[in-house]
């Protein structure tokens, strides 16, 4: 942990490292890229601290941290190891071995499928879902449905960045927290 720096200062530092790419992936889109922050060791530590501290305060009952394919994976292991919790991935179709449950969800350009290993979460376990971005909310809705299919209980969805204008939060039930809102 980095106790000598305030949470606000840590967040400001992380924000300063997020890249902005106009007209990517298509004309008229301003793409905000978390990888700029992840290439900076200090920003990585601050980001971990902010996520972990939030879960300690908001979801201390959490037992499993689930990361969404693929950028959510960058955070769930960091958080889980710091808190001494289990972690599990939700992956795109065909990427997980063993018995899985699946759910289809809509994208702005089509349909995709998420999968979760049936053994990853025990019935009744309390789960925090982590991803880099909340946009339309489709992936977090699908993740919540998958976790429910294996008997897990989502206690919170936690994202690094939220694109508020897309109103994805309105599609989600339960607690949702974003570190940065655009």
Curated annotation (Swiss-Prot):
The reaction(s) catalysed by this protein are: AMP + diphosphate = 5-phospho-alpha-D-ribose 1-diphosphate + adenine
- Pathway terms, separated by semicolons: Purine metabolism; AMP biosynthesis via salvage pathway; AMP from adenine: step 1/1
| Top-level class of the enzyme under EC nomenclature | transferase
A family per Pfam: Pribosyltran
Keyword Glycosyltransferase carried by entry? yes
One GO cellular component assignment for this chain's record is: cytoplasm
In the Enzyme Commission scheme, what number(s) does this protein have?
Answer: 2.4.2.7
User: Looking at the keywords, is Ribonucleoprotein present?
Assistant: no
One biological process term in Gene Ontology: adenine salvage
Q: Which InterPro entries match?
A: Ade_phspho_trans, PRibTrfase_dom, PRTase-like, UPRTase/APRTase
Where does the protein principally reside?
A: cytoplasm
UniProt subcellular location: Cytoplasm
Q: Which domain of life is it from?
A: Eukaryota
Annotated GO molecular function terms are:
adenine binding; adenine phosphoribosyltransferase activity; AMP binding
User: Its quaternary structure?
Assistant: Homodimer.
Question: What protein family is recorded?
Answer: Belongs to the purine/pyrimidine phosphoribosyltransferase family.
Q: Which PANTHER family match?
A: ADENINE PHOSPHORIBOSYLTRANSFERASE
Q: What does this protein do?
A: Catalyzes a salvage reaction resulting in the formation of AMP, that is energically less costly than de novo synthesis.
Q: Tell me what this protein is called.
A: Adenine phosphoribosyltransferase
Native source species: Drosophila melanogaster
What gene name is listed for this protein? Aprt
């Amino acid at each position: 942990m980095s106790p000598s720096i305030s949470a606000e200062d840590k967040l400001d530092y992380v924000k300063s490292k997020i890249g902005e790419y106009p007209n990517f992936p298509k004309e008229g889109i301003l793409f905000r890229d978390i990888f700029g922050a992840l290439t900076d060791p200090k920003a990585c530590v601050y980001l971990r601290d902010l996520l972990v501290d939030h879960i300690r305060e908001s979801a201390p009952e959490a037992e499993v941290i689930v990361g969404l394919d693929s950028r959510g994976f960058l955070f769930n292991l960091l958080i889980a190891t710091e808190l001494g919790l289990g972690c599990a991935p939700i992956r795109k179709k065909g990427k997980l071995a063993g018995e899985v449950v699946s759910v289809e969800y809509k994208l702005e350009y089509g349909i995709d499928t998420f999968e979760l290993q049936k053994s990853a979460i025990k019935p009744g376990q309390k789960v925090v879902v982590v991803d880099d971005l909340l946009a339309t909310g489709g992936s977090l809705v699908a993740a919540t449905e998958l976790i429910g299919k294996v008997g897990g209980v989502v206690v919170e969805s936690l994202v690094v960045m939220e694109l508020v204008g897309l109103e994805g939060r309105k599609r989600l039930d339960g607690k949702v927290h974003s570190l940065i809102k655009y």
